[in-house]
UniProtKB/Swiss-Prot annotation:
Localisation per UniProt entry: Cytoplasm
Biological source species: Homo sapiens (Human)
GO CC, alphabetical: cytoplasm; cytosol; extracellular exosome; Golgi apparatus
Active-site residues (renumbered): Y49
Stored InterPro entries: AKR_Detox_Biosynth, NADP_OxRdtase_dom, NADP_OxRdtase_dom_sf
Protein name per UniProt: Aldo-keto reductase family 7 member A3
The protein's assembly and partners: Homodimer.
Length: 331
């Protein structure tokens, strides 16, 4: 336990995926303000989020993003979907469109959102280097790439003198841990930080869902009533996942009794204290939300201490239960 207490806590990044979709501009402004008031400074968005509304809303908040005197870091991504690609022209179009929406001269971190298997990666990386030389972004990031692709990209960039990626954003939570086996050693070798998305498994690890719910009428959320819902159900909505959650809930009751933390709190505490994320390496957890109340609850949980060993063991048991059907971290 002393090792856990002394370990540097991973940073927290605000995930802006729901801005412009489940959160309107005033709510998004309140959420951003609450996040920054807690002392956090980094916001994650993407060209594709809410069809551009996420970036547009963030750009209208008066944060002076990308300015030399701005303490807020802004991250965005280019995607090879919906008529876009990672070819040089599309890459430039997406980044320059993002800069206009965000009303900033450059972003702090520019990700390749996922691999473009129809474009030679050398073309994409050369174009990224050119955009970096033009001052349009500070750091290069990768997301949803396989470990071997990360190694290939780092080697190509190094040998050609191109900007090297320094951040990898990937799917990671207490019951989705495929990244630990091969990706994490790769990232440590090449010196990339890891930013975790889906820390609550799209909301499944809040414990508010039941497996049978998929057959009934559901409110709009990550699993129902939106463009990405089927992808999230395919990723997480499996009987073994719900059995794993039940194991953890039982352990929470046994360890804490009437004062047991919520499933959400326990899951986030696992991320910050018991996962393989390391604050000393600059790793971070991306916290998404669909309301101000949800963000405040998640931020409070992120500031709490380590879990009882029996609960950590239960999370490990849950992981072993679902390992065989863990969704791939790469695309």
């Amino acid at each position: 336990m002393s090792r856990q207490l002394s370990r540097a806590r991973p940073a927290t990044v605000l995930g802006a995926m729901e801005m412009g979709r489940r959160m309107d501009a005033p709510t998004s402004a309140a959420v951003t303000r609450a996040f920054l008031e807690r002392g956090h400074t980094e916001i994650d968005t993407a060209f594709v989020y809410s069809e551009g509304q996420s970036e547009t809303i963030l750009g209208g908040l008066g944060l002076r993003l990308g300015g030399s005197d701005c303490r807020v870091k802004i991250d965005t991504k280019a995607i090879p979907l919906f008529g876009n690609s990672l070819k040089p022209d599309s890459l430039r179009f997406q980044l320059e469109t993002s800069l206009k929406r965000l009303q900033c001269p450059r972003v702090d971190l520019f990700y390749l959102h996922m691999p473009d298997h129809s474009t030679p990666v050398e073309e994409t990386l050369r174009a990224c280097h050119q955009l970096h030389q033009e001052g349009k972004f500070v750091e290069l990031g990768l997301s949803n790439y396989a470990a071997w692709e990360v190694a290939e990209i780092c080697t190509l960039c190094k040998s050609n003198g191109w900007i090297l990626p320094t951040v990898y954003q990937g799917m990671y939570n207490a019951i989705t841990r495929q990244v630990e086996t091969e990706l994490f050693p790769c990232l440590r070798h090449f010196g990339l930080r890891f930013y975790a998305f889906n820390p609550l498994a799209g909301g499944l690890l809040t414990g508010k869902y039941k497996y049978e719910d998929k057959n009934g009428k559901q409110p709009v959320g990550r699993f129902f009533g939106n463009t990405w819902a089927e992808m999230y159900r395919n990723r997480y909505w499996k009987e073994h996942h719900f059995e794993g959650i039940a194991l953890v809930e039982k352990a929470l009751q046994a360890a804490y009794g009437a004062s047991a933390p919520s499933m959400t709190s326990a899951t986030l505490r696992w991320m910050y204290h018991h996962s393989q994320l390391q604050g000393a390496h600059g790793d971070a957890v991306i916290l998404g939300m669909s309301s101000l109340e949800q963000l405040e609850q998640n931020l409070a949980a992120a500031e709490e201490g380590p879990l009882e060993p029996a609960v950590v063991d239960a999370f490990n048991q849950a992981w072993h239960l679902v390992t065989h059907e863990c969704p791939n971290y790469f695309r």
